[in-house]
């Protein structure tokens, strides 16, 4: 792959995840503090990610893979998304805000597959080349959080009170317009199939991969993945409002350290998989979720700040050791014929169904433990900690270890 193309793809990935990180992390704080949203309403807003994940396969399967170049659809979706971001910036109530965020996520979630398609089409050896491109996406997310906290200080207590967090949507809008325009100059990525080819709902939803459920061990893992997305949703939805409310300085910037941790443990993951094996690696990932929420439950922004920081830094183990390991396991079990269908199915099940249940649960728990306007954060965090521990115990008892091939 030419250096010029590598640079183009790296910029694309950077902007793709800069956009997401620019507003998604702080949305819960903005909604609760500036639009006086309830936990249930905040859950509705975050659930748009899940609805987008559920709808995305239809957009990709029925349109992107058949009629238009991927880079052109990417451009159109981001230009339209930038317009919706401007509407979110101007919204003055949750009722005004919600239709725009729903529309935006329906447009944004398909772009995650599109940037991968554009990248893979240019690569001769995706196994070696893709990670070097994808890491710029994580860098984009980190830079977005760093700018919000350390440069603009939009998430400081005074700035939040003044409504400055709405500027995150403006920043995301500008980045969306930039990526939308830039996309039309990306290398051409034609449709992967002809417009005349018949596409079934079974193919779109990855249902060909259902045969994997004949393997009891994989079925246990699949169900566990959906269930673990419930505590995962608590982090996305409640972590920033929690850290902001208790007075942790630069909360969004510090949360970006979790992505730094993610990159480090991503590089270390093959080592641990080889030394520990599949089951122990997955169990460590589950245990990390329990520990993270216990640290949040008993930490504070004073003498126990270190507990909060460790909870944030556990993100690499939480995500990589379970969810990335799960992708590797799925890839190994599926084989070449249904590999894409299997990855599509588990993505739909986790980011669609699992997270949808998770966001709803997080909203319910948040409202249940908000008494006379005061959030009982200890109780809010103990709920996902207990649930993650229950999943951990059940998984320990019923999942059998398997050997999978891992390239160091």
Language model segments and positions:
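Juxtamembrane intracellular "pre-TM" segments in multi-pass secondary transporters
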Residues: 1-3, 186-223
């Amino acid at each position: 792959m030419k250096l010029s193309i590598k640079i183009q793809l790296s910029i694309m990935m950077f902007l793709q995840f800069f956009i997401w990180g620019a507003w998604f992390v702080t949305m819960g704080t903005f909604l609760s503090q500036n639009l006086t949203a309830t936990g249930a309403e905040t859950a509705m807003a975050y659930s748009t990610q899940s609805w987008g994940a559920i709808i995305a396969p239809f957009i990709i399967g029925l349109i992107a893979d058949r009629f238009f170049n991927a880079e052109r659809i990417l451009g159109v979706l981001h230009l339209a998304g930038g317009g919706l971001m401007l509407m979110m910036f101007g919204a003055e109530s949750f009722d005004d805000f919600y239709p725009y965020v729903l529309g935006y996520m329906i447009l944004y979630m398909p772009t995650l597959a599109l940037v991968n398609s554009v990248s893979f089409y240019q690569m001769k050896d995706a196994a070696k080349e893709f990670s070097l491109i994808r890491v710029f996406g994580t860098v984009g997310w980190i830079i977005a959080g760093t700018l919000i906290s350390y440069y603009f200080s939009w998430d400081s207590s005074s700035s939040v009170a003044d409504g400055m967090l709405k500027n995150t949507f403006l920043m995301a809008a500008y980045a969306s317009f930039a990526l939308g325009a830039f996309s039309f100059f990306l290398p051409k990525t034609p449709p992967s199939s002809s417009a005349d080819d018949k596409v079934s709902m079974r193919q779109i939803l990855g249902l060909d991969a259902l045969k994997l459920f004949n393997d009891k061990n994989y079925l246990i893992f699949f169900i566990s993945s959906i269930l673990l997305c419930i505590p995962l949703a608590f982090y996305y939805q409640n972590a920033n409002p929690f850290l902001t409310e208790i007075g942790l300085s630069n909360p969004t910037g510090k949360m970006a350290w979790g992505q730094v941790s993610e990159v480090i443990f991503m590089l270390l993951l093959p080592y641990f998989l080889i030394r520990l094996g599949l089951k122990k690696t997955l169990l460590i990932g589950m245990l990390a979720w329990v520990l993270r929420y216990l640290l949040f439950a008993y930490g504070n922004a004073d003498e126990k700040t270190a507990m909060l920081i460790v909870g944030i830094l556990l993100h690499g183990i939480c995500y990589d050791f379970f969810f990335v390991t799960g992708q590797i396991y799925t890839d190994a079990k599926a084989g070449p014929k249904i590999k894409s269908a299997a990855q599509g199915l588990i993505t739909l099940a986790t980011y669609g169904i699992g997270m949808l249940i998770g966001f709803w649960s997080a909203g319910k728990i948040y409202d249940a433990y908000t008494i006379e306007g005061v959030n009982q954060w200890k109780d809010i965090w103990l709920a996902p900690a207990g649930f993650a521990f229950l999943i951990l115990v059940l998984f320990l008892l019923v999942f059998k270890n398997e050997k999978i091939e891992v390239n160091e």
